[in-house]
Each structure stands twice: as C-alpha cells, then as structure tokens.
C-alpha cells in the first residue's frame, strides 16, 4: 500500500529574531493542519533553533549566507540584504527543482522577497508573510502615493517632517514615523529602495498572510464609516492578487494546535529571574526590554535610564545585552541587585514567562509587534519607546488608538517617573487591555483566523 506523503510547505523567514519567531509559529500551525513544514534559515540561526525543536515534525534546513563566521547571527541589515540577493537564491532553487519534493507552497517573509522570484521560476505557488502589524504594511504599500503627492521624494526623503500622513482607517502619522527612516541619510535611501523592490515583487503573490488580526484598527476614529468601504475595495482585495489573510496573533495558535515550539530565542534565556519575580508584590515590577534586532537606546540613554530606575525605588527586571551592560554606571549593578535587592539585570529573559508573572506591573518596550501581542495576551500595560521600523506605527496604536500604554518622552528621572505614574495609575487602562485581548485573541478572532487557515489549506490541497 502506497503511503501518501504530506504536502510540503517551505518557509523562508527574514533572518532576525522578530521574524523567525512568528514564522516558526506559522509553521507549527500548518503542521497541525496536515502539512509538512520545512524552515530554511542561515546556518547560525539553524543551529540555534533546530536542536531544541527537532522532534516536532518540522524539518530545518540551513542556508549558507556567505558570512565569515557562520556561528554568529547576521546583524547588519545591508550585509543580510547582500546575502539574500546574491548567495541564497541558487540554494533555494536547487531544492525546489528536486524531482521527489512535493512542494505545495513557499511562504516568504516579505523582507526576504528574493525568494518570490525563485519560487515563481520553479512554478511553485508563493504566499507572502507579513510578521508584524498589518497597519505597517499598509504604510509601505502607500509608498507610490506618498511619492505622487510629494510627501516624500523619489528617494524616500520626507519633504516636510511636520507633515501629517492621512490614510483610511489609520491614525494620523507624521513623516518621522516612516519605517525606512533609520540610520544615515544614505542608509535611509537604500532602505527605501529595498521597500520599493519588495512592493514590486509582491505583485506576483497569490496571498499575503499576516500575523495580525482583522480588527486591529477598530478603534480608529471614523472607522465604522470607512471599514465597509475598505473591505469592499479589498474583499479581501476584490478578487485581485495578493489576497490578504489575517492569521494572527500567531503565538496564540499554539494553544489551539496543541503543538508547542520549544525554543524560538537565538540567545540563552536566564531563568533565574523568575524566582526573584515570585518574591515581589503583585503588579509592582517594571520589566524593561528593547528587543533583539537593533542596538538599543544608546549608551548615554542606558546610563540615564539606569539611574532613573534606581531613583524610582520600584523593583525592576531589565533584559540588557551583556555588551551594553558594560556601559551601566559604576557600582549600579551591585547597588540594585545586592545592596538594595531592588532589581535584576539579565542578558536575555524568558519573556513570555516574565509577562505572565503576576508581579509584573508594566513593560518598558520598544513596541516590537511580537512583544506587543505578548504583553496584550498577558494584560500588561506598556511604557513605549520605539526604536526603529514598524515600531513607531505600533506605538501610535498602543498610545493613541488602543490607549493601553504611554509614550516615554525621555530617560531622565522626571520623564521616567511621570511615565510610570501615568501608565500604572490609569484606572481604565486595565479594562481597555481586556477588551483588546478579547478582540485580538478571543473566540471571534480565533474563528476568523481558523476560517482563513481552512481557506488556504483548501487552496493548497
């Protein structure tokens, strides 16, 4: 009797922590729906995630990225771009052309758009994957209109920084919120070109899968009047490609699928902080983490924030890379961890476990999408300091639309204390968090996500 093989789906994440994590959750969701997932990452990432997840039924394959040190995760945006455009494509093409490989689809992180053309050439259906808030994609999608109206130049430079960006079903954004405005002017122009190329490549996609939920902008002013118009226009997309399928938040899928990704972190998590958290009063601890992808807030700001946290007298847990810990004020670590027992500083924290701990009262965050949704799932208030990319759009929703957080204006004692007071003492914020959690992760949201998974499964079988 011939055994029928499960159809394979190949997943190509962008090689960064905040992109690999949701892609692994997506792969596990398809595994539970009868597919055989194959996740392809650079060697350095492959080593970190494959060993601890090898028994799940997900196949992990390594891609050469041409790095001199294959054991070190890639960190520079433009060196990663060079690897993706010039080194990785032939490797994926060889895999797709293997005669005995039954590939139903290739799922490509839109930041790894190089893989779209490879799959197209091999005649394999392609789905794009947007691992962050869909509002950020809509801002990228608006690039041609931003250029046409003169808000930005042909090279992506804002003509007027104070100018407001107005889009249907979006909060008002400023030109400073544009996600390619990172680094030097030269780097910003190169990032803008990167996004233009990405947009051009998405035209051949059949679907775009998102790690967001369909009602993310329900609280935007005048939403109800424009939502139907937008849906009629989109439907999702009125029969035109690519079709938008909201599947998120994806970390919420594990409870439904009964499949748990053992480890998604590239770094060793310091579990010792959990015991310290258990000793603290409920809703008292400030948790601080500015993410994994970019250098955080800068050495001078780290020093200022450290002294402000100490002056606050509040207990805190700070996830801070060991390299950046070297820039902390002299004697700070000993004072707060030993003398006062006020806080703990770890190089990397088990974030989900931390946020679920009853002692945590608020989360000082860079507003990364994964972190934001984990905080919402745990009903944690947010004190926001966006650093790069889509984080500025996320922050706008957190503070102005959903009203589940406060934007931190600076790192001095007064700014930090004012921010903490506002976020901790808002009597209505807890209720707004509960409502958002229900909307994003409740029964209706899960049903909507499941319908989209079922639709896609039927399309691929």
Swiss-Prot record:
Residue sites binding UDP-alpha-D-glucose per the record: 292, 349-351, 366-374, 388-391
Any Pfam family the entry gives: UDPGT
Record key words, sorted: Glycosyltransferase, Transferase
Signal sequence, renumbered to the chain: none
Gene Ontology molecular function terms on file: UDP-glucosyltransferase activity
EC number(s) recorded for this UniProt protein: 2.4.1.-
PANTHER family tied to this protein: GLUCOSYL/GLUCURONOSYL TRANSFERASES (PTHR11926), GLYCOSYLTRANSFERASE (PTHR11926:SF1402)
Protein name: UDP-glycosyltransferase 82A1
Gene of this entry: UGT82A1
């Amino acid at each position: 009797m011939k055994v029928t093989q499960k159809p394979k789906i190949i997943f190509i994440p962008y090689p960064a922590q905040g992109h690999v994590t949701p892609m692994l959750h997506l792969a596990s969701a398809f595994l539970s729906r009868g597919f055989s997932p194959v996740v392809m990452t650079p060697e350095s990432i492959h080593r970190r995630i494959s060993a601890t997840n090898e028994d799940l039924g997900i196949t992990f394959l390594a891609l050469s990225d041409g790095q001199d040190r294959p054991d070190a995760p890639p960190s520079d945006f433009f060196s990663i771009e060079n690897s993706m455009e010039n080194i990785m494509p032939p490797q994926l093409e060889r895999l797709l052309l293997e005669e005995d490989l039954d590939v139903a689809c290739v799922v490509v992180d839109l930041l790894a758009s190089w893989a779209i053309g490879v799959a197209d050439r091999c005649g394999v259906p392609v789905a794009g994957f947007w691992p962050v808030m869909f509002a950020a994609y809509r801002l990228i999608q608006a690039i041609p209109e931003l250029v046409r109206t003169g808000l930005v130049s042909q090279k992506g430079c804002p003509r007027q920084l104070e100018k407001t960006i107005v889009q249907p079903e979006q909060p008002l954004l400023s030109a400073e919120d544009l996600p390619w405005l990172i680094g030097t002017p030269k780097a910003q122009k190169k990032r803008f070109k990167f996004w233009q190329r990405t947009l051009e490549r998405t035209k051949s996609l059949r679907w775009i899968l998102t790690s967001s939920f369909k009602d993310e902008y329900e609280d935007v002013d005048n939403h109800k009047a424009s939502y139907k118009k937008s849906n009629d226009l989109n439907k999702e997309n009125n029969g035109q490609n690519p079709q938008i399928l909201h599947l998120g938040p994806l970390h919420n899928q594990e409870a439904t699928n009964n499949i748990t990704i053992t480890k998604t972190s590239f770094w060793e998590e310091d579990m010792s902080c959990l015991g310290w958290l258990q000793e603290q009063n409920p809703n008292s601890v400030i948790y601080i983490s500015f993410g994994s992808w970019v250098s955080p807030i800068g050495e001078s700001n780290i020093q200022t924030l450290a002294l402000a946290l100490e002056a606050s007298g509040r207990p805190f847990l700070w996830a801070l890379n060991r390299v950046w810990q070297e820039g902390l004020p002299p004697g700070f670590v000993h004072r707060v961890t030993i003398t006062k027992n006020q806080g703990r500083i770890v190089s990397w924290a088990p974030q989900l476990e931390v946020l679920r701990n009853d002692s945590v009262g608020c989360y000082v965050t860079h507003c990364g999408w994964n972190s934001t949704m984990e905080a919402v799932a745990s009903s944690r208030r947010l004190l926001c300091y966006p650093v790069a990319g889509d984080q500025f759009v996320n922050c706008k929703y957190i503070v102005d639309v959903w009203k589940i957080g406060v934007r931190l204006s600076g790192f001095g004692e007064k700014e930090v204390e004012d921010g903490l007071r506002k976020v901790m003492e808002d009597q209505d914020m807890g209720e707004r968090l509960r409502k958002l959690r229900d909307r994003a992760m409740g029964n209706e949201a899960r049903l909507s996500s499941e319908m989209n998974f079922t639709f896609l499964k039927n399309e691929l079988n």
